Structure formats: C-alpha cells, structure tokens
C-alpha cells in the first residue's frame, strides 16, 4: 500500500512558539560563544606537541542537550515525528603550516561520529597531509544524518579529529587548522551519496605577486633610504636653514615636461616609489 501521508517541514510540524524556542537555542549569545570556545567554529586551532590529538564536536554539549530536549518534548506530545537529527552538508578545513618546509611531520584529519567508541573515520573519509604539502583545503561530506541522542555518557554528534605525527624536536605549534561548517537540525533524516574526502593543495601566498617589475623592492628600499638620509639634516642655525631652504627650492623647481617615450621620461617612471604588499 502506498504511503498517503503528508511531508511537513520542521516549522510546519511545530508551532511558531516552539520554532522561536529552537531559534533561541541555536542563536543565543551563549550558544554562539559555546560554538566558538568548544567547537572552534571559524577559529584557528593550533596543533602542538601537548595537543597531538584534537577531537572537536560540531555541536557544543550544552547546546546538544537543549536541542535534544526540544525535539523530545515535541515527539512525546505527538507534535514532531522524531527526536531530532543533526545534518551537516559539508565540513571545510583550511590547514596551514607554522614551521619551515623541511620539518618532518604530518597531519591526519577525518570526520568521526562520537557515537563510535573507536572514533573511526566516517565511510573512510580521511586525509593525510605532509608538512611540505601545506597549505591545503580539506572537505568532508557525511553520508547520513546523526540522531540527537546520548550514548553512554557521550552526546552523539559529528566531530572533526586531527592527529599530529612526527615533528620531532618541535614542541610548539606546527600547523593551524581553521574549520567551518553549518549544522542543521530537523525531525526528518536521509542518506546521501558517498563522496570521498577532498584534498586541494594550495600554492603559498606570494606577497610580491602584484608587483610586475622585479626591481619594485629595490625602488621601495631606495625611497626609504632617501627619506632616512634627508631626516638626518636637522639644522638649528637660522642662516643655514635659509640656505638649506634655498637649495630645497632649487631642487623643487619643476623641469619642462619630457617628451613621451624619451629616455628621461622612462627613467622618471622607473624610479617612482611604490608600496610593496607585505613589507
């Protein structure tokens, strides 16, 4: 027999008041602060020797409990069709190194389910990055929605796991990982197409790329040196100041405009001071 019921969204299944309650749970100042401090959403997480394994849930524990209670209360009175699911379409991690390229070490990053005691990668979605491969972008796509339940003493949800290997002699931060995602919550769930974890190696940022002429740095340094030399002539005698001012006036006399294409015009353009990005 074919199913003849109606499919309703979360907002349709609950009243406006309960929908507002859910919004307050997700976007209250406390919830936003917890997402930053407990989950490192949009923040840089430093991988150090004393933090070789990092497990970051995608939902704070307090927020998880409140969301689960919201769905359970609606489910118990028949307003919602389930006790709630967490859906994460994609997790994107930007990874950069904070040591030189010759440092021997690597990172292992994957997405796990806190309901799994072994914290195994979900559907084998795991990426290994050697230090000299960085920077890189890593992406994960869960193939199912996670039930909002408690397993033992663990609040079940997705988590980003980062393992640091090697880096002998480097006790400080060797890499920085910035993760971003958007968690969604619904009373309905689904399964999704399996997609392998994505790894995109990124070229290091070239701070001088916007300068087309190779002598831009030399011109900048020369202009700075000229400014330093001129600042050394601090004269206190009024008569000498007058002479210095007259010399300055002679130097500032405008010369006739050079013809376009002449060697003097090209030299004038070549020695115009420029600001180099990053210096």
From Swiss-Prot:
It is found in: Host cell junction, Host plasmodesma. Residues 254-268 have a biased composition (Low complexity). Residues 246-279 are annotated as: Disordered. One of its GO terms (cellular component) is host cell plasmodesma. It holds the Pfam family 3A. Keywords: Host cell junction, Transport, Viral movement protein. Its main location: host cell. Transports viral genome to neighboring plant cells directly through plasmosdesmata, without any budding. The movement protein allows efficient cell to cell propagation, by bypassing the host cell wall barrier. Acts by forming a tubular structure at the host plasmodesmata, enlarging it enough to allow free passage of virion capsids. This is Movement protein. It comes from Cucumber mosaic virus (strain Y). The lineage of its organism: Viruses, Riboviria, Orthornavirae, Kitrinoviricota, Alsuviricetes.
């Amino acid at each position: 027999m074919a199913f003849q019921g109606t499919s309703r969204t979360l907002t349709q299944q609950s009243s406006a008041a309960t929908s507002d309650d859910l919004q307050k749970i997700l976007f209250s100042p406390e919830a936003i602060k917890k997402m930053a401090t407990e989950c490192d959403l949009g923040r840089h997480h430093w991988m150090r020797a004393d933090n070789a394994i990092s497990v970051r849930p995608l939902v704070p524990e307090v927020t998880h409990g409140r969301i689960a209670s919201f769905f359970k209360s609606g489910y118990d009175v028949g307003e919602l069709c389930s006790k709630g699911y967490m859906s994460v379409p994609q997790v994107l991690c930007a990874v950069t190194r904070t040591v030189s390229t010759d440092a021997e070490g690597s990172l292992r990053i994957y997405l796990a389910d806190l309901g799994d005691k072994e914290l195994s990668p979900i559907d084998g979605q795991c990426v290994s990055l050697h230090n000299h491969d960085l920077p890189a972008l890593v992406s994960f796509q869960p193939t199912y929605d996670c039930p909002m339940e408690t397993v033992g003493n663990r609040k079940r949800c997705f988590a980003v796991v980062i393992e640091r290997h090697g880096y002998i002699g480097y006790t400080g931060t060797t890499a920085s990982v910035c993760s971003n995602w958007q968690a969604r919550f619904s009373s309905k769930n689904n399964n999704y197409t399996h997609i392998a974890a994505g790894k995109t190696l990124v070229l290091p940022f070239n701070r001088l790329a916007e300068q087309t002429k190779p002598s831009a740095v030399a011109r900048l340094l020369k202009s700075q040196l000229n400014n330093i030399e001129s600042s050394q002539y601090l004269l206190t005698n009024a008569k000498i100041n007058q002479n210095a001012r007259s010399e300055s006036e002679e130097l500032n006399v405008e010369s006739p405009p050079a013809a376009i294409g002449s060697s003097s015009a090209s030299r004038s353009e070549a020695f115009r001071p420029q600001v180099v990005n990053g210096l």
